[in-house]
């Protein structure tokens, strides 16, 4: 079974979000199950030179784009036993950021065409083409509409994964007409047209044989208007081919027993070592080294989606508790400034690191007691899974993947691995934070809760099995 992942980012090459983690980890897990996965992505100038040097030129072809043919170099390399193809074109991919350019519609139209034009030259017979998010959605659409009659392509099945419905790849109609050479028959509401523009994600949803969302709850949510980003009707129409498969984490990267970034490695049976990470974290940030004061942390993009309006509303009330708070992330300036002001107002309790630091993030996960993630919506979420693996108990809102992976602690049965609240309401969140703090001070209960969190399986194992089953069903 041969699978080709078409992605716009992938660890360890480039990363801007969770898509890169999925593209980096899932193929390795599928390989353990006997599924051959190869990955194709753009050869961005942002890829570290060391990784680019590990690739060789496999082939040079021309890619038809509108009225011209564009150069396409196919570079081939290997990382961790997985074969990668990098699509080389400096005009489109020698940029200072992955996305956000005036010509993104053209850049990813080119990449979509390049993926399809490369397939006959890859020394690899593709059984299933698996595209991800808006950037490669048109690969599946173009395959069905323009390439399926070609004997080289007619057997290929398609899967499309929605990582975040909010970002859809909406561009002017000229992109469809001039670059992809699709006619008027595609510019209507049953096809690519979307409020006067063209929507790439819509193409992926319509044309793919199977669609997955990155958690079962998110799969249900996106069929409702509140979460549906104006595509809920389309998703309801195609819900027969829509499924939800929760993401995992790469346990070779996120594992407190082997993590080289943290001060002291530990497992569920050596939690006294976790407390060394807490002291090291307090020391790093200049916080008082209080063992019995819980550290509440957030490692997050500072955006509205992450529920920061709730945090902002009741932050001072949280500060009335005996807690310390650490925020690591960057994003909208209004949230950055708010947390910087709180750090100024509460110098003995609040510390903020604006930006991202991989090593520090690992230390925050290992050294904190509670991890706050009150998202407005969360397709899957990575932070809560990492926190659980490190025995840092998550406080989450019951949405998307948070609802699927965090079971609220039940004092009657002793079951659960975290704390959760249902409504997007600041005082519901505050009540849940206070409840978590209360149990933190009940040491036997807390130790049991931490052990329950750490002994569950958050790896890609179960997810990879589900994807293998999905691929297999397409080939029967």
Curated annotation (Swiss-Prot):
Which HAMAP family does the record match to this protein? Glycogen_synth
Q: Which GO terms describe its molecular function?
A: alpha-1,4-glucan glucosyltransferase (ADP-glucose donor) activity; alpha-1,4-glucan glucosyltransferase (UDP-glucose donor) activity
Q: What does this protein do?
A: Synthesizes alpha-1,4-glucan chains using ADP-glucose.
- The name of this protein is Glycogen synthase
Disulfides per UniProt: none
Record-linked InterPro entries: Glyco_trans_1, GS/SS, Starch_synth_cat_dom
Gene, per the UniProt record: glgA
Tell me the domain of life: Bacteria
Q: GO BP, one example?
A: glycogen biosynthetic process
Similarity section: Belongs to the glycosyltransferase 1 family. Bacterial/plant glycogen synthase subfamily.
List the catalytic activities from the record: [(1->4)-alpha-D-glucosyl](n) + ADP-alpha-D-glucose = [(1->4)-alpha-D-glucosyl](n+1) + ADP + H(+)
Pfam short name (any one) = Glycos_transf_1
What is the organism field in this record?
Bacillus cereus (strain ATCC 10987 / NRS 248)
Its Enzyme Commission number(s) read 2.4.1.21
Describe which pathway this protein belongs to, using the record's wording. Answer: Glycan biosynthesis; glycogen biosynthesis
């Amino acid at each position: 079974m041969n699978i080709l992942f078409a992605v716009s980012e992938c660890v360890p090459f480039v990363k801007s979000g969770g898509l890169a983690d999925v593209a980096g980890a899932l193929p390795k897990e599928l390989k353990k199950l006997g599924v051959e996965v190869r990955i194709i992505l753009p050869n961005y100038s942002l890829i570290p030179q060391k990784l680019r040097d590990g690739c060789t030129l496999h082939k040079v072809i021309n890619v038809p784009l509108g009225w011209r043919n564009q150069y396409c170099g196919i570079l081939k390399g290997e990382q961790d036993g997985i074969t990668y193809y990098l699509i080389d074109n400096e005009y489109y991919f020698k940029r200072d950021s992955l996305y956000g350019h005036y010509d993104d519609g053209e850049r990813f139209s080119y990449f979509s065409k390049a993926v399809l034009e490369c397939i006959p030259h890859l020394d690899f017979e593709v059984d299933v083409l698996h595209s991800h998010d808006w950037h490669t959605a048109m690969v599946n659409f173009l395959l069905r509409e323009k390439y399926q009659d070609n004997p080289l392509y007619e057997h290929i099945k398609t899967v499309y994964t929605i990582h975040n419905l909010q970002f859809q790849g909406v561009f002017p109609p000229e992109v469809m007409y001039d670059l992809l050479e699709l006619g008027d028959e595609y510019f209507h509401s049953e096809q690519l047209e979307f409020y006067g523009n063209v929507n790439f994600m819509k193409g992926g949803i319509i044309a793919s044989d199977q669609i997955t969302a990155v958690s079962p709850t998110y799969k249900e949510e996106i069929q409702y208007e509140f979460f549906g980003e104006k595509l809920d009707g389309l998703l309801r129409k195609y819900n027969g081919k829509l499924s939800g498969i929760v993401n995992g984490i790469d346990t070779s990267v996120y594992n407190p027993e082997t993590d080289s970034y943290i001060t002291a490695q530990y497992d569920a049976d050596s939690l006294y070592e976790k407390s060394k990470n807490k002291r090291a974290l307090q020391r790093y940030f200049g916080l008082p080294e209080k063992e019995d004061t819980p550290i509440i942390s957030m490692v997050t993009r500072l955006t509205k989606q992450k529920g920061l309006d709730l945090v902002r509303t009741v932050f001072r009330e949280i500060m009335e508790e005996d807690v310390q708070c650490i925020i690591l992330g960057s994003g909208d300036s209004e949230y950055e400034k708010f947390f910087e002001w709180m750090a100024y107002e509460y110098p003995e309790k609040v510390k903020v690191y604006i930006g991202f630091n991989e090593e520090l993030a690992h230390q925050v996960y290992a050294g904190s007691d509670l991890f706050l993630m009150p998202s407005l919506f969360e397709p899957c979420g990575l932070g809560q899974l990492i926190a659980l693996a490190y025995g840092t108990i998550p406080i989450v809102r019951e949405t998307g993947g948070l609802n699927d992976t965090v079971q609220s602690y039940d004092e009657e049965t002793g079951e659960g691995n975290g704390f959760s609240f249902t409504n997007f309401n600041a005082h519901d969140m505050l009540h849940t934070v206070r409840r978590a703090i209360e149990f933190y001070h009940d040491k036997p209960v807390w130790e049991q809760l931490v052990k329950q969190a750490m002994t569950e399986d958050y790896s890609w194992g179960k997810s990879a099995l589900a994807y293998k089953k999905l691929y297999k069903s397409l080939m029967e």
